[in-house]
Amino acid sequence: MKLYPAIDLLNGKSVRLTQGDYDQVSLTEDPLYQAQRLTDAGFAHLHLVDLDGARAQRPINRRIITRIREQTSAFIELGGGIRTLAAMEIYLTIGIDRLIVGSAAVSDPDLVEQAIARFGSNRIAVGIDTRAGKVATNGWLTTSQQTANALLTAMQQRGVTTFIVTDIAKDGMMQGPNAQLLADLQQAMPQATIIASGGVSSLADLRRLQTAGIQAAIIGKAWQTGAIELAMLKQMEG
């Protein structure tokens, strides 16, 4: 199983939020130290989120993201505040491997199609963040009327092949992922690569995702709190 340890950036620090609530910040750490720790542990993929950027609707933590990129050879995917081709160009130029478009996929789907035409489907993913069955946007501060299934279908028709799916109710709660939601989406779109995000708290959760047909997952609070030891995660990844 492909695993993406997560580093969420707020005011230049690595933090964890509970259910995406900016008022529920915990585990403030040095993101450079965390990135090095993950690299030293042998992880080949990192998931970065610019939380300030998601809220401001533009890139904010570019400096620290650049330093992380310079420090590690790992595959890095990045989301948060990426709403223009110019922003994508900047991040891809500094060596970010894949960009995650979230809110813009709802508000400006043509942008996603343009990005794929320009940069390739392997460099652009779409983040689908759901709350009570509807897609949330703008750093999860707004909820649209679009369902996850509808957005996934629409984006796949525009050339998207990789999706990061988060059930906000599960995020940061350490109570397990919404395996049923993920399984339903994967079964509906078997050609899509769906990366699970939110709620993973144990190796058993990862096995449940595998049983659901999901072959990649983002690990946030579980690795940062030590609920799952990095050595055990690496063993799970193989």
Swiss-Prot record:
Source organism superkingdom: Bacteria
Catalyzed reactions: 1-(5-phospho-beta-D-ribosyl)-5-[(5-phospho-beta-D-ribosylamino)methylideneamino]imidazole-4-carboxamide = 5-[(5-phospho-1-deoxy-D-ribulos-1-ylimino)methylamino]-1-(5-phospho-beta-D-ribosyl)imidazole-4-carboxamide
Family according to the record: Belongs to the HisA/HisF family.
Keywords: Amino-acid biosynthesis, Cytoplasm, Histidine biosynthesis, Isomerase
Organism: Lacticaseibacillus casei (strain BL23)
Listed InterPro entries: Aldolase_TIM, His_biosynth, HisA_bact_arch, Isoase_HisA-like, Isoase_HisA-like_bact, RibuloseP-bd_barrel
Active site: D8, D129
Cellular-component GO terms for this entry: cytoplasm
Molecular-function annotations in GO: 1-(5-phosphoribosyl)-5-[(5-phosphoribosylamino)methylideneamino]imidazole-4-carboxamide isomerase activity
Functional pathway: Amino-acid biosynthesis; L-histidine biosynthesis; L-histidine from 5-phospho-alpha-D-ribose 1-diphosphate: step 4/9
Compartments (UniProt record): Cytoplasm
One Gene Ontology biological process: L-histidine biosynthetic process
Main enzyme class: isomerase
Protein name: 1-(5-phosphoribosyl)-5-[(5-phosphoribosylamino)methylideneamino] imidazole-4-carboxamide isomerase
EC number: 5.3.1.16
